């Protein structure tokens, strides 16, 4: 056999390897092929190809492994079990940029499934190999490395700490300054995954100077980038007053309010979440949001999310806006009044009534309670907005969750304690359970002694008669309030409306002796 014919065998073997690995990589894109390849032992066949002397075969083998591992946690565990990760990590520092992208994809695909798999990636030494990739000239290699780092960090605080200790954050801050939009997105996402866990991790991201570079990107034309930027700023701001102030001092207001009107649903939602995380900390931060026009912007956002709910099928989109309004209103009567003036009651009531998910109804009930609990004027705004009746309905409905019932009861109790709008109180008297009637009657007992017109209206609307009927079946505080209200009327009026009055009259007929001529 001549030398030429021998080489032909080698060439045929190489072509066969290329054909095989490319076919496997292509087949791995279709879910219906995964189980067949797994049963055929694809992992064991691909593993030696990672060390092939032909770079294109190495890259295709890594790509195929990444697609398989990305499909399910079982296949990702198979990658770990076949000891493929150490080979990838070793090659990551040796090979060309194409292989580095493919290898980083495999690490990301394994790490994404669970904390245990992400820990396996860390234990393989992947972070030490990924960090230099963040300094590569090729932006696509940086993207692949940043993406894998974010997927490792997202699971737990310990994993995020490992990522931080590897020195990734300063390099991610440099990456976000690069011109490539995709690299900016992935870097912002990775920093968000790091800082979401603890105040200390968020502080490390802040100390690296990230906020100064994130803040201007709020106005970037790319929607996917704005999603990640708003998310990252919210993850920083949520931990403490100091971190929220760092975000505010980076001049995110009023620009972030414009994101509440963005055409992209996730930009709007993430912006609302960021505002919520800032608003919840102190009255001063809530006031800053209101002074920037935030109350009206949030109210419009909630109303708009309600209108778009049918289109997107995403009721959760309005949740951060509802909660942000509640946090703002909770701090002071002035801030609550700003919400009322911004016409915030109606969209919150609409969410309470129309939203199918109980946790959003519960958030709406809580926010309405924060608005109405301050003064009689605040409570009147909710009473005139027909809120009380709907809170009561949520409280007593058989299908309401425990959380919704609790929040509706607390909100109703807080509003009733300040409510002096008797026309709104009276319908609740008949329809409420005893535990709510108690709060309603307490208000009547406090208000009727000082208002002649209210006393007359209470009689004309049947309230006094209902009280006499109620008096026969209750005791305790309820009985005390009924007696206090009865004391506002002449005894003969009270007697006239008592259930036994007709019997008393009939008894008098029996006792009466007519004058016989």
Spans of model-derived segments:
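Buried hydrophobic core positions in alpha-solenoid tandem helical repeats
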Residues: 3-9, 45-47, 87-89, 129-131, ...
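Alpha-helical solenoid repeat architecture
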Residues: 18-31, 45-48, 59-71, 90, ...
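Short, hydrophobic/charged alpha-helical patches characteristic of ARM/HEAT alpha-solenoid repeats
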Residues: 8, 33-40, 57, 74-82, ...
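Short inter-helical turns and helix N-cap capping residues of alpha-solenoid HEAT/ARM repeat scaffolds
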Residues: 12-13, 53-54, 95-96, 137-138, ...
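N-terminal "cap/leader" segments of large eukaryotic alpha-helical scaffolds
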Residues: 1-36, 41, 45-48, 494, ...
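Residues that form ligand- and interface-recognition hot spots within folded domains
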Residues: 41, 50, 83, 92, ...
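Intrinsic low-complexity tandem-repeat regions in disordered proteins
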Residues: 65, 76, 85, 107, ...
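Alpha-solenoid helical-repeat scaffold
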Residues: 374, 378-517
């Amino acid at each position: 056999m001549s030398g030429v014919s021998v080489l032909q065998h080698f060439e045929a073997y190489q072509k066969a390897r290329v054909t095989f690995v490319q076919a496997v990589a292509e087949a791995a894109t279709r879910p219906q092929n995964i189980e067949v390849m797994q049963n055929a032992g694809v992992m064991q066949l691909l593993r030696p190809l990672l060390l092939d002397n032909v770079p294109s075969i190495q890259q295709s083998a890594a790509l195929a492994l990444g697609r398989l591992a990305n499909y399910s946690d079982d296949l990702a565990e198979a990658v770990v079990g076949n000891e493929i990760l150490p080979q990838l990590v070793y090659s990551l520092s040796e090979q060309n940029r194409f292989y580095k992208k493919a290898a980083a994809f495999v690490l990301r695909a394994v790490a994404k499934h669970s904390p245990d798999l992400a820990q396996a990636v860390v234990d393989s030494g992947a972070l030490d190999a990924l960090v230099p990739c963040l300094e590569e000239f090729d932006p696509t290699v940086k993207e692949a490395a940043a993406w894998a780092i974010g997927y490792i960090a997202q699971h737990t605080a310990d994993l995020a700490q490992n990522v931080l200790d590897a020195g990734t954050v300063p390099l991610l801050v440099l990456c976000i300054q690069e011109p490539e939009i995709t690299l900016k997105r992935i870097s912002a996402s990775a920093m968000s995954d790091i800082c979401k866990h603890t105040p200390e991790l968020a502080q490390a991201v802040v100390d690296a100077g990230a906020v100064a570079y994130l803040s201007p990107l709020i106005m970037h034309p790319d929607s996917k980038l704005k999603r990640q930027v708003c998310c990252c700023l919210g993850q920083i701001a949520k931990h403490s007053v100091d971190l929220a102030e760092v975000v505010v001092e980076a001049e995110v207001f009023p620009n972030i309010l414009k994101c509440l009107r963005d055409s992209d649903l996730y930009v709007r939602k993430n912006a609302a979440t960021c505002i919520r995380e800032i608003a919840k900390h102190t009255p001063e931060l809530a006031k800053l949001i209101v002074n920037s026009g935030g109350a009206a912007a949030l109210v419009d956002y909630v109303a708009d999310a309600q209108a778009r709910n049918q289109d997107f099928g995403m009721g959760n989109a309005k949740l951060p806006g509802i909660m942000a309004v509640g946090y703002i209103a909770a701090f002071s009567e002035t801030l609550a009044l700003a919400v009322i003036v911004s016409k915030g009651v109606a969209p919150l009531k609409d969410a309470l009534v129309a939203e199918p998910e109980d946790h959003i109804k519960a958030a709406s009930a809580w926010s309405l309670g924060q608005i109405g609990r301050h003064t009689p004027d605040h409570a009147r705004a909710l009473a005139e907005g027909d809120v009380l009746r709907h809170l009561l309905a949520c409280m007593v409905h058989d299908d309401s969750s425990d959380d919704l019932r609790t929040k509706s009861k607390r909100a109703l109790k807080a509003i009733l304690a300040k409510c002096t709008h008797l026309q709104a109180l009276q319908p609740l008297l008949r329809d409420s359970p005893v535990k709510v009637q108690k709060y309603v009657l307490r208000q009547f007992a406090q208000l009727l002694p000082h208002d002649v017109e209210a006393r007359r209206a209470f009689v004309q609307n049947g309230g006094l008669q209902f009280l006499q009927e109620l008096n026969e079946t209750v005791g305790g505080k309820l009985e005390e309030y009924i007696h206090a209200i009865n004391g506002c009327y002449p005894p003969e009026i009270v007697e006239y409306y008592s259930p036994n009055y007709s019997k008393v009259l009939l008894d008098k007929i029996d006792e009466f002796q007519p004058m016989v001529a």
